[in-house]
Amino acid sequence: PYLSNMLNFDPDMPAFFLYYEKGELVGLLTVYADDPDVEVAILVHPNHRRQGIARALYRSFETETASYPIESVTFQTERVFLERHPEFASNWGLVEDEETETWLGKDRRPYPLATVSNLDVLLADRSYQDQISQLKFQAFSEEHESREVVDRYVAKALKDPESRLYILLKNGQVIGTCTVDLSSNTNYLYGLAIAEHERGKGYGSYLAKSLVNQLIEQNDKEFQIAVEDSNVGAKRLYEKIGFIKQTQVVYLKPKE
């Protein structure tokens, strides 16, 4: 789960619920809410499952967030968990959403990468904020109905000490962008986007490889990336450059 409320639409809304037993943390519920359609992830220690901890955490979430304008709740889980617990969804009155995503990982081996004279991969600053927002909004407009959500992502990534927002410049113009979250034990890449008119020319691959090479020099972490399974082109790109599937993330919604 994403252990930050930095991107939530209301930073005052409770985002983390902890369940302790005899002083030991055995359950965690996290809330990811970049808009009022929120995503909830619940983790319970394997030795403490089937004891009502997940439901207790969820009841606490419902109570504590009742005064906030939440429009819907989606549960995030993994395909492997549902295969091991096939009764989970029906017990909770949930059905699978058709949208799934795959998390892929990569070791610290650098890429052989020739420099291209008119391309630069740089850490972004505020002067590029509007160009980055525009590019991300065009690339991910189906995910984010409002430009305001994209603007918030970009502004927070520029400010947050645990984030790095990179841009790919071609002849001085922003044609690509990618954010790296450093808050966990991996370099987590997300939001990689190439301007529509520049796709299919290898720039996505160049940006990803360049980022990996730069980050290898800056820290000792391995790499992780998440991609929607419907985004076949991006998934193929990451697999082609050596990212290996780790898990499939599934979203569950209450039955209508």
Q: Model-derived features: where do they sit?
A:
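Active-site rim helix/loop that mediates acceptor-substrate recognition in acyltransferases
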Residues: 1-25, 143-179
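Conserved donor-binding loop and adjoining core beta-sheet/short helix segment
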Residues: 2-65, 76-80, 178-187
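A structural microfeature
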Residues: 27, 97-100, 176, 204, ...
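Acyl-donor-binding surface of acyltransferase catalytic domains
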Residues: 35-36, 46-117, 252-254
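Hydrophobic adenine-recognition pocket in adenosine-nucleotide-binding enzymes
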Residues: 44, 192-194, 227
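Conserved acetyl-CoA-binding loop-helix of GNAT-fold acetyltransferases
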Residues: 50-63, 194, 200-217, 235-240
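A short beta-loop-alpha structural element at the N-terminal edge
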Residues: 119-134
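Glycine/small-residue-rich hydrophobic helix-like segments
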Residues: 150-214
